[in-house]
């Protein structure tokens, strides 16, 4: 922990198309090597695919997907007397958002569709319905926390 004053979080500018900070954050998560225009094309392309495939509002699907994938608890390693314990801890809200977006990105990258936009659209639609690889990851993290509930008294 730093001993100086706490540095304030920077506000993320909302994206130009949907005026949403969450979409803007997601574009930043998708971005590789600073290529923001490519990331925007992927995310907006995925939203177009969602509109075409499911004829639903892409923002609602995106919000539902992120909300469904958000983890409530995770495990952190804690060393106590020569043994490492996986201690379940609650996830703070900002980290929940970051983890869910990261898991959606990774799940989309592992899919088999042709373009990244199609893969992302497929993963977002599945996550919004409570299915998909990102949801599987969330359940896995929750299962780990449940299995290690006995060590919760070692909280940080």
Curated annotation (Swiss-Prot):
Output the Gene Ontology cellular-component terms: small ribosomal subunit
Instruction: Please name the CDD domains in this protein's record.
Output: uS7_Bacteria
Q: Name one GO biological process term.
A: translation
Please give the SUPFAM superfamilies that the UniProt record associates with this protein. Ribosomal protein S7 (SSF47973)
Cite the Pfam families for this sequence. Answer: Ribosomal_S7 (PF00177)
Question: Which GO MF term does the entry hold, naming one?
Answer: rRNA binding
Keywords, ordered alphabetically: Ribonucleoprotein, Ribosomal protein, RNA-binding, rRNA-binding, tRNA-binding
| Function field | One of the primary rRNA binding proteins, it binds directly to 16S rRNA where it nucleates assembly of the head domain of the 30S subunit. Is located at the subunit interface close to the decoding center, probably blocks exit of the E-site tRNA.
Tell me the protein family, please.
Belongs to the universal ribosomal protein uS7 family.
Supply the PANTHER family for this chain: RIBOSOMAL PROTEIN S7 (PTHR11205)
NCBIfam families documented for this protein = rpsG_bact (TIGR01029)
Quaternary structure annotation from Swiss-Prot or TrEMBL: Part of the 30S ribosomal subunit. Contacts proteins S9 and S11.
Name used for this protein in its record:
Small ribosomal subunit protein uS7
State the organism named in the record: Azoarcus sp. (strain BH72)
């Amino acid at each position: 922990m730093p001993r100086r004053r706490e540095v304030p979080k920077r506000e993320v500018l909302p994206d130009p198309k949907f005026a949403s900070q969450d979409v803007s954050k997601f574009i930043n998560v998708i971005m590789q090597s600073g290529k923001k225009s490519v990331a925007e094309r992927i995310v907006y392309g995925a939203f177009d695919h969602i509109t075409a495939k499911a004829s639903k509002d892409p923002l609602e699907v995106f919000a539902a997907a992120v909300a469904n994938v958000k983890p409530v608890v995770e495990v952190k390693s804690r060393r106590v007397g020569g043994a490492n314990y996986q201690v379940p801890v609650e996830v703070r809200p900002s980290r929940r958002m970051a983890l869910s977006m990261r898991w959606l990105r990774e799940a989309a990258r592992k899919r088999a569709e042709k373009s990244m936009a199609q893969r992302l659209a497929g993963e977002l639609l599945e996550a919004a319905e409570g299915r998909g690889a990102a949801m599987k990851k969330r359940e896995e993290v929750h299962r780990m926390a449940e299995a290690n509930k006995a060590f919760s008294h070692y909280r940080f």
